[in-house]
Amino acid sequence: MKKYNLEDFKLGWLIGDFEPSILRTDQFEISIKKYSKGDYEKAHIHKLADEITIIIVGKVLMNGGEYKANDIIVIEKGEATDFKVLSDTITVVVKTPSVPGDKYIEPHLKLSGIV
């Protein structure tokens, strides 16, 4: 048995083709991310990976749509999304495959109307 602490991993990313990683694999990535109300991630796309975001706790705005605890959002490769935190939130994110650097900011897009 091994013990890890989520705080030891970069932005909650704990499995994937990167270090540190509990399991190094190029097949998928998993993160458990904590956000505070008001946090915002600019619109971006993944050219190679599909992403599944599960809202465990909290409420967020993605592409102008509001999502809450227990919602599962599937974002296909090439589909842009932004992410505005409406209340303190915890997510689980799965991306497949795991491709380091496969995040491309789309600065001209304001999908949730955030300026």
Predicted regions and their residues:
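Conserved short histidine dyad/triad with adjacent acidic residue
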Residues: 26-46, 77
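A short, N-terminal "cap"/entry segment at the start of jelly-roll beta-barrel domains
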Residues: 1-27, 32, 108-115
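Conserved hydrophobic/aromatic positions in well-ordered beta-strands
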Residues: 31-33, 53, 92
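Short histidine-centered beta-strand/loop micro-motifs
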Residues: 21-24, 41-47, 63-65, 84-85
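A short beta-strand-loop-beta hairpin characteristic of the jelly-roll/cupin
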Residues: 46-71, 105-106
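A generic "binding-loop/recognition-motif" signal
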Residues: 28, 48, 79, 87-89, ...
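Short acidic-glycine-tyrosine-enriched beta hairpin
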Residues: 63-82, 91
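A short hydrophobic beta-strand segment most commonly corresponding to one strand
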Residues: 87-108
